[in-house]
Amino acid sequence: MKIWNKIPIKDNGDKLIAIPSCLKLLDPHPYFHLGAPYEDKTSIWKLREEVINRLVKVNDYLISKSSFNLLIYDSWRPLEVQEFMFKRAFLLECEKSDIDISFENIKSYPSILKKVEKFWAYPSNDNWCPPPHSTGGALDVCLSDKDGNLIEMGSMVDQMDETSNPYFYANIKNEEAIIWNSRRNLLREIMTKFGFAQHPNEWWHFSLSLIHI
């Protein structure tokens, strides 16, 4: 059991609302583009109201301190979308290993399941241990230029390997690594300044919580 599953959950009643136009969104949405089962395009970009309030402050502060903008890569995920993406990640990992398997036999390959769960929360419908993105309190963010173009951070969002660790480039001293590490540090420092916690395995994933969810 992951440590956050031991923490009692209490819904604070914060509304799930559309993300305002003052925040930059990745277009097209990466999972909708893959066929993830969102109800419609209006249901893609949503977060809890307090999360949005703090993101606006993050973006304003980021712009005042750098040449970057905050770019939201992904936000709230309906459970059906979480299931779609989890299955896709698992089956792609099986394909890389030349394993022909149906998702129903997922437990037959615990090493692959363990790797996937390091980056993708299992699509549990248990209200006491929901996937973080399905609560509306977690999101994936990047840095962009003023036109919304992604800034290189040293790995792609959702890249399931060690380069996605927030501190992977901290002790690598070539020119590119130093730049990527400084950008990751900037993103983390500003997000945490406004109350967000960073996922220990993903430089892009943050949640408004006292723990990493």
Model feature map: region roles:
Residues 211-213:
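Conserved small/polar residues in nucleotide/adenosyl-binding loops
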Residues 1-75, 79-200:
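Extracytoplasmic cell-surface/polysaccharide-interacting catalytic and binding patches
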Residues 206:
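Conserved metal-phosphate-binding beta-hairpin within the catalytic cores
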